[in-house]
Amino acid sequence: MASNESLQTTAAMAPVTIERRVNPNLDDELPKPFLPRALVAVDTEHPSGTPGHQHGDMSVLQQHVAFFDRNNDGIVYPWETFLGLRAVGFNIIISFFGCLIINISLSYATLPGWIPSPFFPIYIDRIHRAKHGSDSEVYDTEGRFVPSKFEEIFTKNARTHPDKLSFSELWNLTEHNRNALDPLGWVAAKLEWFLLYLLAKDPHGFVPKEAARGVFDGSLFEFCEKSRRSNKQQ
């Protein structure tokens, strides 16, 4: 009895633990799911990460940001963020406001010194300092990828399909992850998932699990850019 209780993931007096379930057998489906991965974004379907994706010895969070480093100098300026957003398929308006919001909000935390820069650069080697609250915690505080937290996105929130998220389910995800007294984190999380929804939703209005995983290591951005190039060449 005590042994069974020590492994329970739900509590009758805490209905939220029943509503938002976790996978108790995750370690049978993925080796060491609670071990943060520094180089690859893994899940139960991709235990070795994204096939063909080059990590470049960067953390998974750094890989996510590095796509927008268009000249590969380790620094992302607003105009590079704009070009990156355009490259994956966002229109000019979203790309313009997106680059302003992203660089203005993230730049200072990544700077090597205390003096702000009027160019709002984002330094990739310090991007872990810009991690905001009220997020999914799939990235840890050093920028590693935590597989168990990624799987929880779907076990806790996917109600229509186990491997897809609707817009309302994404909204609920951001509501569930809210930390107290963290309005900046609340807004940032909603903006991030809204942009992913615009970018990756399927014809039925769902974001597939593979697309969500791909955004964490940046492979989704690479896929979208290559797809757009191929379509233009046809």
UniProtKB/Swiss-Prot annotation:
Gene Ontology molecular function, alphabetical: calcium ion binding; heme binding; monooxygenase activity; plant seed peroxygenase activity; protein homodimerization activity
Domain EF-hand: 56-91
EC number in record: 1.11.2.3
Binding of heme, residues: H64
Compartment list: Lipid droplet; Microsome membrane
Modification N-acetylalanine occurs at: A2
InterPro entries: Caleosin-related
UniProt KW Membrane keyword: yes
Keywords: Acetylation, Calcium, Endoplasmic reticulum, Heme, Iron, Lipid droplet, Membrane, Metal-binding, Microsome, Oxidoreductase
Biological process, per Gene Ontology: negative regulation of lipid storage
Tissue-wise expression: Expressed in pollen (at protein level).
Binding-site residues, Ca(2+): D69, N71, D73, E80
UniProt record similarity statement: Belongs to the caleosin family.
Function: Calcium-binding peroxygenase involved in the degradation of storage lipid in oil bodies.
Protein name: Peroxygenase
